[in-house]
Amino acid sequence: DFFVWTSVPSCPYKKIFYNWETNKAEKCVFCYPRLENGLPQICAETCVGRMRYVGVVFYDMDKVEAMAATKNEQDIYENTLDLILDPHDPEVIKAARAEGISEAWIKAAQKSPVYKLVKEWGVALPLHPEYRTLPMVWYVPPLSPILQRVTSDVYLPDAHEMRVPVQYLANLFTAGNTEILARTLQRVLDMREYMRRRETGDGPIDHNVELTEDQMYGMYKLLALSKYNDRFVIPSDVKVSREGRLEMQHNRGFACPTGGCQ
């Protein structure tokens, strides 16, 4: 895995512990000291491709056990989406406030790029959902080069005409469900075709698409033109005001007895 062999060894926040078999092991801890202070992981912030997004997602804890107990592993992805709650829903906002979730976290969830990619547009998928671990690291499957036999007469190919087989990607992201994987790829292809027609003035797309024009343009802006604050929407975990936190850091250092400077 490229991430394991490059990002983790060079990461200053990784966890190193002794392993009796390999003599050493390095684990990603998701840069929790940075996240708790409203900062993204160092690998996400320094990513040259600017293709990593970090945000808040609300989900229903009461449904987790039922999701994990799903008999057909190809249904786990759809059941996982059912766990994710709409942060704009008044009932969800009311329940979040009742649970003591701050307004900063609610606003962060409403602006979350992760919610848009995962639930609103449905173009991000979990890695190996059949393990039933409820992963919250999601991936937009890649659009690989098209096959040689269709390059001469096709500008944008169908999802099944990519060089990387749909079944291979489905085994990674949807527990082998090729229908969901092909649908996800087609949404990204539709966005690309929409933007091409928008720039060239060729008119609307001549086939049925699942997303609206506003959704496809919003996807284009997030994936291609997003700024730092659009890609990383992370509320601070500190319970005190910024002024109060700085005052405690000045008087006591970062290890505050009250826990306010964590």
Model-predicted segments: where are they?
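Catalytic cores of enzyme domains
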Residues: 24-30, 120, 127
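Long, compositionally biased charged/polar accessory segments in the mid-to-C-terminal portions
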Residues: 49-262
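Iron-sulfur cluster-binding cysteine motifs and their immediate structural context
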Residues: 1-23, 30, 36-60
